[in-house]
Amino acid sequence: DKKDYSRIIGVAFLGMCINMLMFFKGLELSTPINSGVIVTLTPIIILILSSIFLNESLNFPKISGIIIGFTGAVILIIYGNQSIVINAPNIPLGNILLLGNSISYGAYLVFVKKLTEKYQTVTIMKWMFLVGSFMTFPVTYSDFIEISWNNMPFFALWRIGFVVICTTFLTYFLNVYALKTLPPTTI
């Protein structure tokens, strides 16, 4: 349906482009502890966005969970690992990018819900990955061509394939499939 084009482009932008680019750059700039803690904010973000855009009710247990989860994440980030970090060149920027990643992925899960009510999972994934690939291409092309694919050992190629297929494609596929019957806050 032509009226769904903008939603497909929007969820591809949120779920494939912004989400992935901010996540990987945030990992590069921040610490592993901070990245793990900030990514745990995603369910809180989904709950808030679902209440705003999908009219899901916020009750006392949900609001309490938001407050406790957010407080715990902030405490861990501020008071967590106090040791000197060598390989995190810009922790504040990395943390902001990781928060942007969590927000964009949460928004993706909320906004893709409408598409799951209308289209098959494979159809959504096909268009989302295609559109997302075109969106990320200008940013990732220079890194991609620097890789010496011919000299890469098979075990490295196999591991890259595993990450792309199992941890990326299957995760997105199963999330979209689950959204056909469940609200985003459950996923």
Q: What does each model-identified segment do?
A:
Residues 26, 52-54, 58, 115, ...:
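Hydrophobic/aromatic residues within transmembrane alpha-helices
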Residues 28, 77-91, 141-160:
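Membrane-interface helix termini and inter-helical loops of multi-pass transporters
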Residues 43-51, 66, 73-76, 109, ...:
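Hydrophobic transmembrane alpha-helices of multi-pass small-molecule transporters
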Residues 23-63, 184-187:
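Specific alpha-helical transmembrane segments that line the substrate/conduction pathway
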Residues 25-42, 91-103, 155-165:
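Structural signature of hydrophobic alpha-helical transmembrane segments
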Residues 46-47, 84-144, 174:
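Transmembrane alpha-helical segments that form core, pore/gating elements
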Residues 9, 58-81, 136:
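Hydrophobic transmembrane alpha-helices of multi-pass small-molecule transport proteins
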Residues 1-39, 75, 164-182:
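Specific transmembrane alpha-helical segments of multi-pass solute transporters/efflux pumps
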